[in-house]
Each structure stands twice: as structure tokens, then as C-alpha cells.
From Swiss-Prot:
GO CC annotation terms, alphabetical: cytosol
Region (Disordered): 129-156
Gene name as annotated: rbfA
A Pfam family assignment: RBFA
Identification of the protein by name: Ribosome-binding factor A
PROSITE patterns: RBFA
UniProt similarity note: Belongs to the RbfA family.
PANTHER family cross-referenced by the UniProt entry: RIBOSOME-BINDING FACTOR A, CHLOROPLASTIC-RELATED
Subunit structure: Monomer. Binds 30S ribosomal subunits, but not 50S ribosomal subunits or 70S ribosomes.
Gene3D superfamilies the record matches: 3.30.300.20
Organism: Salinispora arenicola (strain CNS-205)
Biological role: One of several proteins that assist in the late maturation steps of the functional core of the 30S ribosomal subunit. Associates with free 30S ribosomal subunits (but not with 30S subunits that are part of 70S ribosomes or polysomes). Required for efficient processing of 16S rRNA. May interact with the 5'-terminal helix region of 16S rRNA.
Entry keyword Lyase: no
Superkingdom of this protein's organism: Bacteria
One GO MF term attached to the UniProt entry: ribosomal small subunit binding
Amino acid sequence: MSDPAKVRRHAERVRELVASVVRSQIKDPRLGMITITDARITADLRDATVFYTVLGDTAAQSGTAAALESAKGMLRSTVGKALGLRHSPTLTFVLDDVQDQVKHIDDLLAQARHADAEVQRLAARAEYAGEAQPYRVEEEPGDSEDETPPSSQDQR
């Protein structure tokens, strides 16, 4: 097993190398507006996964995927020479769906804001369910207006 810091360093180097080679050396017309977002490499440094995003529709994404697959050998040899490892890591390219996730989260946040606004609107018009004083109050015998205390003249 390799040191995790070493693995992380090699993964970052793979990302930088693939991005620079894609930008400067690959002249495939199918290659769209691509951004290399991340790279991960296994602990034995033999397999690397490169994540990328493409600006455009699904046709641009599929064309870019085909261009990366056709340039995989050249990219692997360039990465292997630059890293100086005994074995060049195999490269796997994965379309990163970060943009779709961001759009989905934005939609969920918009729905939550709308629901909060609806709750606030309903709360502003809300009234108490029942009387203003919901509890029974026991009347004391002296507080009643109907009952008058017996006067001294009535008792004779």
C-alpha cells in the first residue's frame, strides 16, 4: 500500500497532466469544450479515473468521450513518463455530472423557498382556533352580579 499523501499527490498530477495534454496536444475535432475536474488513482497506482465535464449537449458529450477514448494511449504514455512510475496507470474517463446535480439542487432549493413563502402567507392570515380565552374561569361567589347579598331588612 502507498502513502495516502503520495496517492493524492499523484492523482493531482494526473489531473494536471491530462488537462494540459488535452488542451495543447490533442487536435481531435470531436473534442468539445472540456474541463478536467478531478482524478483519482488507486492505492497501488495502477488505475486512474479522470473526471471531466463538457459544455454542450449530449452530442458534444459523446463526441468528447470518443475523442478521449481514441487519445487514451497517448495520454497514458505521457502520464506514465511524467510520473516516473514503474507501471503507467490505466486511464478511465468518466463524465462528471456535477452540472446536473447543481441544477437539481437549485430546483429543490427553489421549491423549498416557494413552500416557505406559501407557509408565511398562510401564517399571516391565520387566526386562533377557538375563543380568545380557551380556558374555563371559575367564578367566585361574590363576583356574580345576579346574586345580591341578603340585606339586613330581609332577615327579620
